[in-house]
């Protein structure tokens, strides 16, 4: 049992203890205030000094306590935090007579200390594990989408940019032919790659500038531009456009199809609120949380629209930051990929991942569908299926799914299906002569293994706890703390906001357990025997 009346001995960033003579409220602290000081005491704050240009008036440790406390109170704006520093007795006690920092100092501190904020977050998580607040056996991962600060109509679509870049390239090739006709170039554009065309047009532009023509000559009725000046303007405009297109394509990258002009890190994606899938795409980030015993033990951020590629980065970060290794991993069907299964098993994790066909596979319609390869007889040694009519369906090709990274085989019936009495039930809307389908055999086997794990007694218990712990953290952040849109531009600053919110949720949960004297065992719902 914990003694909540015990005083907290304050210390500075170097760990030197002191007794405050300015508004010392250590004996009158609220449970969440006392818990915050307890968890923040004795951490390594040395990394904060490296990002400050001069010695700050407010100690980095005190500034971190002030910001986390403000997030716990639901105040995330730097101006609101500044007002809180002048009025809140707890923060005044933490400042110990030092003038309250202004909003610029607070904002600059959060902006420059993103990595240091992440470091103390994981220091606190390790401390929670050391005092027995975490189960340290099963980790639950889930993700959500939070809207970026970027404007809603600032979208840049990769396909549209690529299409315009192709048109611009064709125009530049025509302009090179025009330069040849004017005697400004002797290079023929036919058969040349675009890099050579681009370099030659830059030379043409320089040659026109050397002619001493009036490149800014006015245009309009009664004025005729010199053909070389007209060519110069067209070349300059298209060269600028092709540079802009190349920069946009490079910023978007290979793994996404859009970005925002005002926040290039954000990707336009469909939000969770758009259940009917008829709303507007919004610039947002994919935020991931790993939970254990109702505490958030890990956070990542990405611009992926799905959760396929977020499992491995999260587990790599947990292995790097935490002082222990989990044995079980649990997630929903959004993480159901071969790549994730193989990584988890290769690194010693037992994957409790719900298959994407978990619900539909239980229906009578699914189980009685003779056209699905899952319901056909499969010869694993010779790699072929046998349909409901006893005909052989052999493998004729293979491929890899770009989204999930799963390999699949292409199977086709060795005989024509014309005249088969089961064709209408087996092929339904297909107009092909013979049965053909793609079968993810490797993924199929992994799903069978995952289904067996999830249907075991331990799997049922883990699934029940997943719905409580993984979803509960988002309920605190998005529901109670009203985090629906980030207030900063860029992925790094958005991630700092997310970390601070996760930090605040952890402290509040620890305070509730400490106040209710529930610190003996980690949160875990045990399945009662029937």
Language-model features and meaning:
Residues 5-6, 10, 56, 67, ...:
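Anion-binding and metal-coordination hotspots
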Residues 91-95:
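Short amphipathic alpha-helical interface patches used for protein-protein assembly/oligomerization
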């Amino acid at each position: 049992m914990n003694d909540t009346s015990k005083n907290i001995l304050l210390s500075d960033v170097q760990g030197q203890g002191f007794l405050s003579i300015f508004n010392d409220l250590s004996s009158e602290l609220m449970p969440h205030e006392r818990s915050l000081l307890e968890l923040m005491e004795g951490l390594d704050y040395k990394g904060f000094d490296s990002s400050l240009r001069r010695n700050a008036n407010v100690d980095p440790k005190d500034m971190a306590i002030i910001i986390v406390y403000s997030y716990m109170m639901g105040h995330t704006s730097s101006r609101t935090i500044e007002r809180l520093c002048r009025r809140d007795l707890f923060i005044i006690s933490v400042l110990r007579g030092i003038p309250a920092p202004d909003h610029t100092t607070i904002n600059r501190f959060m902006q420059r200390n993103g990595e240091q904020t992440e470091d103390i977050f994981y220091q606190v998580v390790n401390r929670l594990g050391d005092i027995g607040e975490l189960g340290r056996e099963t980790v639950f991962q889930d993700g959500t989408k939070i809207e970026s600060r970027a404007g809603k109509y600032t979208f840049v679509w990769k396909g549209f940019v690529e299409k315009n870049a192709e048109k611009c390239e064709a125009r530049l090739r025509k302009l090179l032919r025009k330069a040849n006709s004017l005697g400004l170039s002797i290079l023929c554009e036919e058969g040349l790659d675009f890099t050579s065309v681009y370099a030659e047009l830059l030379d043409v532009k320089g040659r026109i500038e050397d002619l001493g023509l009036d490149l800014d000559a006015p245009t309009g009725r009664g004025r005729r531009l010199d053909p070389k000046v007209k060519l110069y303007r067209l070349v300059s405009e298209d060269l600028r456009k092709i540079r802009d297109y190349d920069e946009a394509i490079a910023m978007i990258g290979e793994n996404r199809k859009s970005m925002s002009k005002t926040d290039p890190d954000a990707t336009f994606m469909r939000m969770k609120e758009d259940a009917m899938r008829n709303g507007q795409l919004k610039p947002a980030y994919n935020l991931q949380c790993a939970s254990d015993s109702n505490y958030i033990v890990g956070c990542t951020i990405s611009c992926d629209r799905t959760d396929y590629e977020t499992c491995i980065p999260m587990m790599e970060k947990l292995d790097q930051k935490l002082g222990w290794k989990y044995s079980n991993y649990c997630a929903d069907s959004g993480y159901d990929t071969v790549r994730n299964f193989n990584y988890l098993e290769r690194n010693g994790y037992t994957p409790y991942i719900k298959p994407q066909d978990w619900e539909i596979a239980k229906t009578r319609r699914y189980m009685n569908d003779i056209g699905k390869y899952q319901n056909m007889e499969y010869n694993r040694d010779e790699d072929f299926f046998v349909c409901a009519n006893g005909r052989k369906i052999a493998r004729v090709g293979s491929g890899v799914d770009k989204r999930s990274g799963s390999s699949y085989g292409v199977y086709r019936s060795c005989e024509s299906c014309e005249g088969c009495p089961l064709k209408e039930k087996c092929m339904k809307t297909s107009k092909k002569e013979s049965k053909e389908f793609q079968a993810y055999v490797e993924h199929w086997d992994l799903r069978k293994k995952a289904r067996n794990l999830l249907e075991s007694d331990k799997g049922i218990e883990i699934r029940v706890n997943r719905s409580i712990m993984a979803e509960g953290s988002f309920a605190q952040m998005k529901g109670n703390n009203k985090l629906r849109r980030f207030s900063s531009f860029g992925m790094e600053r958005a991630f700092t906001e997310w970390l601070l919110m996760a930090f605040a949720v952890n402290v509040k949960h620890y305070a509730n357990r400490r106040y209710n004297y529930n610190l003996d065992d980690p949160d875990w719902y045990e399945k009662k025997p029937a």
